Structures are given as structure tokens and as C-alpha cells.
A protein has these predicted regions:
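Alpha-helical transmembrane segments and immediately adjacent membrane-interfacial amphipathic helices
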Residues: 3-26, 43-165
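Membrane-interfacial, low-structure loops and terminal tails that flank and connect transmembrane helices
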Residues: 30-41
């Protein structure tokens, strides 16, 4: 069991990077549906935050089972704000909108990756950073209330894809 958890901890960043490179700014059919639903529905964004929270809790559990140190407790404390949807929404929006904050978070994650005992903090920071890249920007969410945005579906979808990132 412990070997499986070590394997998950080791492979997770690489799987997340592969997912990022395969899906970021791609116009696949399921990604278009994802873009549209996350922009148009608050419940879809809420579900996205719940899935992110579930992944973070699972990673914290894997870290706790394999390495019990203070970094795991710090990673668990970093996960707590994602239990509140409005706070998680604000965090993901700020990371998505501010390139400086996103790069700082990723640099901090890479620094934590170099120290073996800080792996759990790396996993939380890296997962949240990648998740914020797929979160819709505030600009495209505010565009959905404009009167000219409610034309036909195809035009609406093209505007969402254009301004999503």
C-alpha cells in the first residue's frame, strides 16, 4: 500500500503536466463544453472547486501516510481555504488574473520540489496553480451579462473561447 502511495506522489506532478500540455488552449469538443459550462454556470465553477478540494485532500492523505512531518501539516493548512467556495473562487481568480502571482507560486512550488520533505507543499501549490489556469477569467464571466452576448450559441462559444484565458 505504501509503495502505491509513493508511486502516486511521484507520478502525480508528471500526470498533471501532461494533462496541462494536452488540454491548455485546445479546442476539443469536450473542452469547448467545459469552457462554456464553467463560464455560464456558477454551479459548474463550484463543482470545479469541489473536485480541486478532493484532489488536494487525497494528496494530503497520501503525504500523511508516507511522510509524517510538519510540511504535511502546512499543506493541510493550505488546503483548508478551499473548503469554502467563495474563498477558493477568489484564490483561483487571483492566480488566473495575476501573472506575477502565478509565476511566484510556481517558483515557490519548484523550490519546495527540490527539498524532499517539502513535497506535500509542492503538490498543493502546483495543483492549485495548474487548476487556476483552467479557471475562467473574470473578464469572460462578466461578459455573459452583456446584452449582445445573448445572441446565438456558436457566436457565444467563440467569444468564450477567445477571452477564456
Amino acid at each position: 500500500m505504501i509503495q502505491i502511495l509513493y508511486t502516486i506522489k511521484f507520478l502525480f506532478p508528471f500526470l498533471l503536466m501532461a494533462l496541462f500540455f494536452c488540454l491548455y488552449k485546445k479546442e476539443y469538443g469536450f473542452m469547448k463544453r467545459f469552457y462554456y459550462k464553467v463560464v455560464m454556470s456558477y454551479n459548474a465553477r463550484k463543482f470545479y472547486c469541489i473536485v480541486l478540494l478532493t484532489v488536494l485532500i487525497f494528496l494530503n492523505w497520501c503525504s500523511f501516510e508516507t511522510d509524517q512531518n510538519y510540511a504535511v501539516a502546512c499543506a493541510a493548512l493550505m488546503t483548508i481555504p478551499f473548503m469554502f467556495n467563495k474563498v477558493a473562487d477568489r484564490i483561483l481568480h487571483r492566480l488566473h488574473e495575476s501573472l506575477r502571482l502565478l509565476v511566484t507560486t510556481l517558483i515557490l512550488a519548484m523550490v519546495c520540489y527540490t527539498a524532499p520533505y517539502l513535497n506535500s507543499i509542492f503538490q498543493v501549490l502546483f495543483t492549485v496553480s495548474v487548476a487556476s489556469l483552467f479557471y475562467p477569467s473574470e473578464r469572460v464571466i462578466s461578459m455573459k451579462s452583456l446584452p449582445e452576448f445573448t445572441t446565438n450559441f456558436i457566436a457565444r462559444l467563440n467569444v468564450i473561447i477567445k477571452f477564456y484565458y
